Amino acid sequence: MMHIIFTGVECTFKSSLAQAVGSALARKVCPEFAREYLDHFYPTPSMDKFPREQFDAIAKGQIRAQKTYGYYNDGQCIFDTDGLTLEIWGADKFGARDIQWLTPGAPSFYLLCAPTNSYTSDEYRIDGHRREELHLKFVELLDALGRPYVILHEPIFENRLFEALRIIKELGI
C-alpha cells in the first residue's frame, strides 16, 4: 500500500488530478491547505509581498492536514501536495527551511506534474514565468531525497488524468 502525492509548480492540474484520481480509485484525498487558507484568511492577496507569518501558518496547516489524512501511516490516500512544496516555496521566497517539511511519510509515490500545459493566472499565482525553473527544483529535490516519482507530461487535463491512472495501474499503487 502506498500513498500517491501530486506535486509540482503552480497551475499544472495537481488539485484537479488529485480529486479525479481519488474519485476514480475511491480513495480519500487530502487537499492542499494553502488554497483553502488563502480563500478564507487572505481573500485579497498581494502575493508579491506575501507575509512570512502567512506562509508559516500555511506550512503548519499543511503538515496538520497531512497528519490528519494519515501521511505518516501506511495507507492509500491521495495527497494534493506535501512538504516538498513547502520546502521549495519557503526557500525561494523566504530562505526558510524546516526539517519537518521533508520528513518522509509512509511509503508514497510522487506524480510530478510538468508545466507542459497552458498557464492560467489567478490572484494566487505569481510565478507563471518561472514554471520551468521551479519544476527543475522539484526534480532536483525528489532526486536528492531519493523519493520515487514519475513526471506527468500530458498537456491536456483529460490526457494527464489517463496518464496518471495508467501509471498507477502499471505500478500497482
Locations of regions flagged by a protein language model:
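Conserved substrate/cofactor phosphate-moiety recognition/catalytic segment
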Residues: Q19, S23-I63
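A glycine- and Lys/Arg-enriched "phosphate-lid" helix/loop adjacent to the NTP-binding pocket
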Residues: F94-L161, G172
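Conserved lysine of the Walker
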Residues: K14
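Hydrophobic anchor at the beta1->P-loop junction of P-loop NTPases
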Residues: F6
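The conserved Walker
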Residues: E10
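Pre-Walker A (Motif I) flank of P-loop NTPase domains
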Residues: M1-H3
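Active-site flanking residues adjacent to catalytic metal/cofactor-binding acidic residues
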Residues: P31, F79-T81, C113
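Conserved nucleotide-sensing/catalytic segment adjacent to the nucleotide-binding pocket
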Residues: T44-A96
